[in-house]
Amino acid sequence: MSAFVEFQHVNKVYHTGEVDIQALNDVNFEINKGEFCVIVGASGAGKTTILNILGGMDSLTDGKVFLDGEEVSAYNKRKLTGYRRYDVGFVFQFYNLVQNLTALENVELAAQICKDPLDAAEVLAEVGLKDRMANFPAQLSGGEQQRVAIARALAKNPKLLLCDEPTGALDYNTGKAVLKLLQDTCRNKGKTVVVITHNQALTAMADRVITVK
């Protein structure tokens, strides 16, 4: 069985003036469908570059990237836009919620652009916010706002959930609860979840750990 996510000899070089910065050097890894994968490494090691390439937000210099048998790295701009919209859900360290929309409206907004969205209210209930749907972001704690952001990503019903330091702005216990939520999502919904972090302690929760040096 071929891997669900595959990086083959991926290189990324950023050109800044006369200086070339090698962000990724011959990166190879596989992630199977339904795995909870944690990518760890020091700041500047290239973790976010990997996530941006996998999420279709950045291009590689050479190599190949596959998702579900499709060579994402060969997509043109139009196909990449569709890929980001339909196939990938994103969760970032900062929640990026629309402040004048309720929790429910924030999730519904994301669901509107998708082919096969999940019910926004049901997803919010699943992440523990059944009683907070009518609240605005300013009325929610950091952990609750991150749960709205996770619900927003899940409501798209993506093939892949990408999380960049999702607990970075949260205290330890809140962060742990958010990670447990991501892990449960992976288990219960069969989603493939990739979490980028510098926190080695999170590796204990993972099905697969990828260390970037």
Regions found by a protein language model. Give the residues of each.
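ABC family nucleotide-binding domain
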Residues: 4-7, 11-212
